[in-house]
Amino acid sequence: DGMGGMGIFRVKADALNLGSIIETLNKDGAETIMVQRFVPEITQGDKRILIIGGEPVPFSLARIPQGTEVRGNLAAGGLGVAQPLSDSDWAIARALGPVLAARGLLLVGVDVIGDRLTEINVTSPTCFQEITQQAGFDVPAMFVTALEAALAS
C-alpha cells in the first residue's frame, strides 16, 4: 500500500527476478499485492483527475516519467503538467462522480493512464497546488464550496 510510486516494478517478458520481486512485495505471502498490465501510454503521463463533490475538476495533472523511469509519480521524479481533461477523462470522471458522491466521498483523486482507470485514491488525492498554479483553475475554492454545501445539507 505504498504511495509516490513506491513498490512499482516493470516486469518484462523474460520475467527476470519475478519470484524475488513477488516475495519482496508480498512479504513471503503475508501481504496482498496488486498487479496490472503495463500501459505504454504512461509515456504521456499518469493523469490525476480530482473529483470534488461528485464533479470533476476540468484539468488533470499528467505526471510524466523522466528518463528511463516508468513511474510518473512526482515523488519518483515525474514531471507534473496540468492539462484539460480529454473526452475519455471526462467520460470516466462523470461516470464515477455520482457513485463516489453517493458513497459520501467528497474528495477523490482518480488516476488514468491513456484511457484506462488505474486507481481510485480516497486517502491521498493530491495535485491541488500544481493544477491551480499551472492551469489557473482554483481547485481549493471548488473544494471549499463543495465542503460548505456538504455541511449545509
What residue ranges belong to the model's regions?
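Short glycine-rich anion-binding loops that position phosphate/pyrophosphate groups of nucleotides
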Residues: 1-3, 125
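Short, solvent-exposed secondary-structure boundary motifs
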Residues: 1, 38-42, 98-102
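Phosphate-binding site of ATP-dependent enzymes
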Residues: 4-92
